[in-house]
Amino acid sequence: MIGEYIDIDAPYSFIGGGVLEPEIIDGLWDFWNDPAMETLFEKTPGHCGGMGEQINKEVKDSIDMTIPRYIKDKRICSYIDGLAEITREYVNYWPMLRTIHWDLQSDFNIQWYPKGGGFKQLHCERNNADIESVTRVMAWMTYLNDVEEGGETLFDIQQAKVKPKKGLTLIWPSDWTHFHKGCPAPNEEKMIITGWYNLVR
């Protein structure tokens, strides 16, 4: 983690995070472009979670790669270690989270967005009655590249718009209080890695 904990400047936003080292992010790019990984983990058009998992590019225009939680690839493990460091700072900022039993236990995704792409519809991360969804406590996301024009993540209720910066990692509650969407970047591609912390027994 580079520097100190970041609290997104919006009243009680509960959106925070930090910045990961460039070499960690470069490792994720290497993983994405690794032909050996493409044979193991298929890249597929992005599905619209909570909408019957259909593909609709008017809602979500992306290519996604799902990564198993317990993969042993050094590039992914290095990222998970960095995410854990930022998560500890988030919990230090919101210490009531220590009273809840949660962990990183579900698979997660690297998502590539073409020019003009994005998850363009407001959505939250706990959006149906599936056990995977209802146990989500927090979402997390890291931007894998800088975007000069557009590409922001808009948190609607908080009226917070976060500009993509390589390594910037955000954590936020998974509930309806944090409906958000991705603003299209008209002239640039965008890449993120994203997933959830879930309740555990």
Residue ranges and their predicted role:
Residues W32, P95, P114, R126, ...:
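Short beta-strand segments enriched in hydrophobic/aromatic residues
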Residues I110-P114, A129-E149:
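Short, conserved beta-strand element in jelly-roll/cupin
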Residues V134-R136, E149-R201:
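Catalytic core of Fe(II)/2-oxoglutarate
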Residues I2-H101, Q105-D107:
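Non-heme Fe(II)/2-oxoglutarate
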Residues F119-N127:
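Histidine-centered catalytic micro-motifs
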Residues E38-T39, F119-K120, V147-L154:
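Substrate-binding/catalytic groove segments of enzymes
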Residues L104-G118:
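A short glycine-rich, His/Asp/Glu-containing loop-to-beta-strand
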